[in-house]
Amino acid sequence: MKAPSNGFLPSSNEGEKKPINSQLWHACAGPLVSLPPVGSLVVYFPQGHSEQVAASMQKQTDFIPNYPNLPSKLICLLHSVTLHADTETDEVYAQMTLQPVNKYDREALLASDMGLKLNRQPTEFFCKTLTASDTSTHGGFSVPRRAAEKIFPPLDFSMQPPAQEIVAKDLHDTTWTFRHIYRGQPKRHLLTTGWSVFVSTKRLFAGDSVLFVRDEKSQLMLGIRRANRQTPTLSSSVISSDSMHIGILAAAAHANANSSPFTIFFNPRASPSEFVVPLAKYNKALYAQVSLGMRFRMMFETEDCGVRRYMGTVTGISDLDPVRWKGSQWRNLQVGWDESTAGDRPSRVSIWEIEPVITPFYICPPPFFRPKYPRQPGMPDDELDMENAFKRAMPWMGEDFGMKDAQSSMFPGLSLVQWMSMQQNNPLSGSATPQLPSALSSFNLPNNFASNDPSKLLNFQSPNLSSANSQFNKPNTVNHISQQMQAQPAMVKSQQQQQQQQQQHQHQQQQLQQQQQLQMSQQQVQQQGIYNNGTIAVANQVSCQSPNQPTGFSQSQLQQQSMLPTGAKMTHQNINSMGNKGLSQMTSFAQEMQFQQQLEMHNSSQLLRNQQEQSSLHSLQQNLSQNPQQLQMQQQSSKPSPSQQLQLQLLQKLQQQQQQQSIPPVSSSLQPQLSALQQTQSHQLQQLLSSQNQQPLAHGNNSFPASTFMQPPQIQVSPQQQGQMSNKNLVAAGRSHSGHTDGEAPSCSTSPSANNTGHDNVSPTNFLSRNQQQGQAASVSASDSVFERASNPVQELYTKTESRISQGMMNMKSAGEHFRFKSAVTDQIDVSTAGTTYCPDVVGPVQQQQTFPLPSFGFDGDCQSHHPRNNLAFPGNLEAVTSDPLYSQKDFQNLVPNYGNTPRDIETELSSAAISSQSFGIPSIPFKPGCSNEVGGINDSGIMNGGGLWPNQTQRMRTYTKVQKRGSVGRSIDVTRYSGYDELRHDLARMFGIEGQLEDPLTSDWKLVYTDHENDILLVGDDPWEEFVNCVQNIKILSSVEVQQMSLDGDLAAIPTTNQACSETDSGNAWKVHYEDTSAAASFNR
């Protein structure tokens, strides 16, 4: 016995009876009926089951009894579904076996969710309501011309008259034969011979409907739908209505108490509503924001066998039967219909039967507007609100809308996709501190351009994708190292060799290293007293750490500083003293430094935790120093990869650009400092270079020769050694970076420090950290002039990019006072991982500011923000940046593979609080900062009030693509969860209420277009699906008028998109989105 294609299994007691065709059964059941698949989770409503019994027996539903200890709903597992049809009336019904469950697995949840996407209705069929002439004994059945041409086999019009035999089978597999002829005036398609026998046998009357269905084998099937007629009421002596009700309720209560299966029968033509609802559909309805006055649509079957949506308004929310079924969700919405002819529409409906209208404004505002949370990978668009938001918006649901009985890992009230996303995206807890992998000696090419992340092309820090609480525990560095090791499988052999050599020396070095580190840390703690005596050694910086921040950061700075060569220390001290010579506010933080010194004395135990890591690093450095020939052989044997060739092209491009550009003007006030800085630095670099060339890597010296950093970084080194090279590069170039690293807490300092330059994890281009914003603009500008003409292309690249950091500087003194006593600064976002602002250096007068300056975003107004500690002004308009061809998007697009085509899982969305303290405008790197109306509200007073500048807010991922349609709210979808274009069009049509109008792009009045990563406008469906998923940036649904306007204007951006409640920004153009009603957009988002 063959099972139906849709997975419905017949019951075993049917013997060899052939199962009913599922498509024909659903066609006879009606266009709104779709049974859930076997093995899925459903919600059974006993109250609705009793309504079906009452409707079939013509009884009133006002007196349906209840049963003790039977809840108003049961979550059950659907074990089997058997399709039936009455042999006399051909009325269809289904037999279902349900089993109440308290906990369930993920497969059942997925089956329930996938069941909503299955369309069980036939695709090729026609339905006609019979007329009086159709049911007469001599007339025949008149078939509509288009239906006959589509469903019936083609006629041979060479015959006179054209005619053929039609064979069709009904639900009981009975064969019926009709004569199909094309005749009459006017000519029409008729079924003549055999039709009158069919009508009399089935006892059809005018008003009944007949369906012809053609299956996938082109075989015809025949079914009927009977009109709803008054049937004679059964005598109470035959069967009792109350006994029927009590019987079905008792069976459900017994099954619920014992978790045993029970059987029900569902009659789709007699039941007023479905009382076995898929769990996914039920959850989806719960998380819709339903409130009084809300507009909605509801589907109804029409007289011509079609489907129509009726518009209505929610007028009340209450229990249908507050006495017997208190707190039940069955028909708990009172509704009113727009059309006066909708008198036969029900006055009460259930929440899962309606479709809320997607509009930005409501007739009566609901008590809660849903915020635009980031959409997790695999999450449907309408299932985003959490349990507390749902309770606030729907207080009538009480406390039992979730699964109180479910003793499973799925939290009460959470939807299917929310639970799945929590299982898949379980963040790293703050207490979990993973150990560094053993393969720390893996080699890494600094010029590896094979990454999809554009920020890695200039050695920018990778986006921080970990949770905010874990960024202080060094997991980001571990993840970054692991990614680099995975990207270079060719170096596995060399890694193993280095690991073996490292393990031989590790035990010998460990004890000696522990003693030296303790001695050096004690010496450095004593040396910090020099600062209080007013000497020039400002390099011993102390970080302003919050109490909940790990305190090993400053200790590791001390340790690294003690390992710097003397020449490097003197050079950095001289540079820092010259760059900060005019800063009189430096002495105001003496008390803070004393406090930090006391704090560091209590943290000496932190060094012991890092001994294992430090010993491995030192032994690795010695291995590298002892085996220079091996490194050279590896360099010679390695051939240039395509990524290296791309790097060379990029470097040549940079050289050409720098030759065309002139040196930025420098004010006369900075000329003495710049000249003295250049002379001192050149002298110190020569001493450092000569001393390092004479003395190779000494035991315990955690540094590299300075000559290494003046050469193109092509030596294969480990990630830690690369960080050390970058740090010494800062020393040599006179940079005064004190930015925190991945996994370290941000610190605020009073002066540039050499301590953080010696830190292992400091990146040379972490140039938007909080410390750098608080007082290093002068040194950055000076170093730009000194090294503008560096011969090294890579060094020019570092210098040129770092010199263009000029926006978003905050008042250092105010920031220091704000952060010193701020104890809850735990979820700060590393701004350098999210974006960087490039602006030309402009010199202007000093403007003192004593309050937090608002960030200078690229708005329409020409606003200037001045750094309070340096003679530099920073333009707020970013338009001047895009004119620089060096940082234009097309250059990187031509040079870098997959530019702008970064995986969607690394595009981060920043919260409004995080954006409000920094300035992000990067014309060369695509970046999506999230919902634009959050940026629109950047000038709110919330920046100054409540919670401070950095409220506790976790970093969130954005992996979804925006979809816009004029006159509707913008939506966001995850294109990766669709399997093809058909499913995408169907879902978009459902979202925007245009079902059936997007599926056929040739005949539809709507055109689905998208913008790719090159800002080209293309028609959806032309490219292969995989390529479309990788390059789509946004999608627009255009009407025919908008398509004509676009063809005339030649620009998709010229088409107005009014009342877009939430939309994202295009790649690169960070703040280019405007609202016609900003206040309405902001309030809708909040």
UniProtKB/Swiss-Prot annotation:
Disordered as annotated region, ranges: 454-504, 545-564, 624-647, 659-788
Gene3D superfamilies in the record: 2.30.30.1040, DNA-binding pseudobarrel domain, Phosphatidylinositol 3-kinase Catalytic Subunit, Chain A, domain 1
Induction (free text): By auxin and ethylene.
Biological processes, Gene Ontology terms: auxin-activated signaling pathway; callus formation; lateral root development; lateral root formation; leaf development; response to auxin; response to ethylene
Domain of life: Eukaryota
GO terms assigned for molecular function: DNA binding; DNA-binding transcription factor activity; sequence-specific DNA binding; transcription cis-regulatory region binding
PROSITE patterns, sorted: B3, PB1
GO CC, alphabetical: nucleus
Residue ranges of every copy of the PB1 domain listed in the record: 958-1051
DNA-binding region: 126-228
Keyword Hydrolase on entry: no
Knocked-out gene: effects: The arf7-1 arf19-2 double mutant is defective in callus formation.
Pfam families assigned to the protein according to its UniProt record, in alphabetical order: ARF_AD, AUX_IAA, B3
Location relative to the cell: Nucleus
Protein keywords: Auxin signaling pathway, DNA-binding, Nucleus, Transcription, Transcription regulation
Compositionally biased tracts (Polar residues): 454-485, 700-710, 747-771
Cited SMART domains: B3
Domains (record comment): Interactions between auxin response factors (ARFs) and Aux/IAA proteins occur through their C-terminal dimerization domains III and IV.
Subunit structure: Homodimers and heterodimers. Interacts with the auxin-responsive protein IAA1. Binds to JMJ30. Binds to ATXR2 in the nucleus.
Family: Belongs to the ARF family.
Function field: Auxin response factors (ARFs) are transcriptional factors that bind specifically to the DNA sequence 5'-TGTCTC-3' found in the auxin-responsive promoter elements (AuxREs). Could act as transcriptional activator or repressor. Formation of heterodimers with Aux/IAA proteins may alter their ability to modulate early auxin response genes expression. Involved in ethylene responses. Regulates lateral root formation through direct regulation of LBD16 and/or LBD29. Functionally redundant with ARF7.
Descriptive protein name: Auxin response factor 19
Organism: Arabidopsis thaliana
Gene: ARF19
